[in-house]
Amino acid sequence: GPAGPTGATGATGATGATGATGATGATGVPAGRNKIINGNFDIWQRGTSFTASGYGCDRWRSYYTGGTTTAYTRQSFTLGQTDVPNNPEYYTRLVVTSGNAAGSRASFNQKIENVKTFQGQTVTVSFWAKADATKDLTVEFLQYFGTGGSPSAYVTATPQKFSISNTWTKFTKTFSIPSITGKTLGTDNNDYIDLAFWMDAGSDYNTRVSSLGNQSGTFEFAQVQVEEGSSATDFEYKSIGETIQDCKRYYMHLLNIGGGGYATGSGQTARAYTYATFPARMRVNP
């Protein structure tokens, strides 16, 4: 597979009622258009501070290698702030220390389940970001065809590199996602399209990141949206309850599960079995 994040794939997209304030955005704009899950960074089932490469905020993974390290934390907006609209509660901070090598990299990724998503279409990414000083950032989409059998090699859309500053700024970037005509899927049902924000990338990754280069610094993100079309609509809010149900398709913290359960055992086999009903249907068996 690609030199990128691993693990459970992302989601096909949000569905259902739109929840909190501003849910549908502009008049006539459909609900469920944002294919990013937890783009408002509301749900953190695993904790709020991480240093290992991997998942932190639900559905969002920090990936680093080649001597680079990243500290990945939840941050709270000040009550009443006006820098980022609509009163979000949290944002994500990544403090990157580059390994300063050709193979060094740090990225912040979400996988969107099903590589067919957006294939052959124009999509628009919108998000708020800032850094500790002026830094470059590259946004990339990668189509991964899964494992098992003889799947096609991954394909990337043309990346976009640009500068971010030390003040919160909204960025809007439009991409042409390649067609998957003639491609072959793997048989393991783990294909996806990956959104990556690259913060550090040595020369080994030049073609994927428009020669971003090695850099260290603090990068912060809020209100990430990916939607079909060539323009960005207002950020689509969802209720906390709906968002956590979306997240639980991929990960859930099983603590004090509500509902009935039962256990059985046998003295002859010295085994015991416990059964419980999960609060959401998961993408694959846990």
Stretches with model-predicted labels:
Residues 2-286:
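Extracellular and organelle-lumenal recognition/adhesion modules and their flexible linkers in secreted
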